[in-house]
């Protein structure tokens, strides 16, 4: 165990620490998180429009008219379909904050650059036609959402890097001292803003002269498609989970670090399922953000709900009994920092093995269930990750009982994996407590005799 701890401390932790502190990954994570409140709000209306209750659709049609579902889709589209737009601003804002430059100006410039990179063409089907034509003059809503997420990420980081380099080299317009700070800041952004817009405009013109036709197409082919294949595969998902758990083992927030890389892929897959779910079509994706939040990591990273319940019900040592009482409440809402750092799992080889193995098992089992059709796929509904299991599995699948059943199976399997390791750890803690009592008891007896 000491050898394992030494390897973790000397080899893994320095690398993991540098990754965790990488400002671009942090900005990606924090910028995309900015979209979450909107997605959850949109998911609320998506659930209302697709409640799995017999006669519900007929009742709504009689009460609100035949177009009731289309009207409920308005807020869904307004929240989901600006994911890329919000990310373009949010990522640039967070990255500029980390560089210590004006974040608001950086976000606004990134937003303009993202719109500049987007072709203003929308598909249109004329009456009697058999093929869509592209009509200019309109912003394509689809490219403002998850389909434009990779372009938004790249432009946000590139534009902010250009912005901060020019600012840090002091190549800016300086206003007199009497000018209000807000006005002065806006003029400071003129030169870096012009540089960003000019470069993105030039890049768009160059790409339009190629078979790719747009920056969105070239990013999709060269970056989006390969990463989506990786993130949408069983092997890629297993690797992502293993890396996440190893980072946690070093005391780093693995979910945030890995999420900074994988979230764009999994959110894009979520939105693809949402679109298919709204249209009543077969759901195309299995590996979405909800797949991991709802089915894989039940109780928090490492699928530790089963471990906490075991601790609460079966612990013999005083320390584990007390920790189980404290941790069971948060664990129901998928918060497990109390046991990761309090048990601890961090830097603990005895518990590290099941902590890594358990989510790999739940990934595999859930994938088998969904790929065979025995379990419903996530319907693109952004159920909050803090929602307790069973309820979350039911809602995330659009009201399918199989989603809740799969969660129950994963909890049971997690218990089987964790139990023998927990028993060893609890036995060790119990022995330490008994040894401590044996040491303290003679000392207490001697004190009494001395007093007499």
UniProtKB/Swiss-Prot annotation:
Residue ranges occupied by any PTS EIIC type-3 domain in the UniProt entry: 8-421
InterPro entries: PTS_EIIC, PTS_EIIC_3, PTS_IIC_cello, PTS_Sugar-EIIC/EIIB
Gene Ontology biological-process entries: carbohydrate derivative transport; phosphoenolpyruvate-dependent sugar phosphotransferase system
Pfam families: PTS_EIIC
PROSITE patterns: PTS_EIIC_TYPE_3
Parts of the chain that traverse the membrane: 31-51, 72-92, 104-124, 138-158, 187-207, 218-238, 246-266, 291-311, 351-373, 402-422
One MF term in the entry's GO annotations: protein-N(PI)-phosphohistidine-sugar phosphotransferase activity
Membrane topology: Multi-pass membrane protein
Keyword Transport: yes
Induction of the gene: Induced by lichenan, lichenan hydrolysate and cellobiose. Subject to carbon catabolite repression.
Iron-sulfur found in the keyword field: no
Domain comment as written in the entry: The EIIC domain forms the PTS system translocation channel and contains the specific substrate-binding site.
Entries under NCBIfam families matching the protein: cello_pts_IIC, lacE
Function: The phosphoenolpyruvate-dependent sugar phosphotransferase system (PTS), a major carbohydrate active -transport system, catalyzes the phosphorylation of incoming sugar substrates concomitant with their translocation across the cell membrane. This system is involved in lichenan transport.
Name of the protein described by the UniProt record: Lichenan permease IIC component
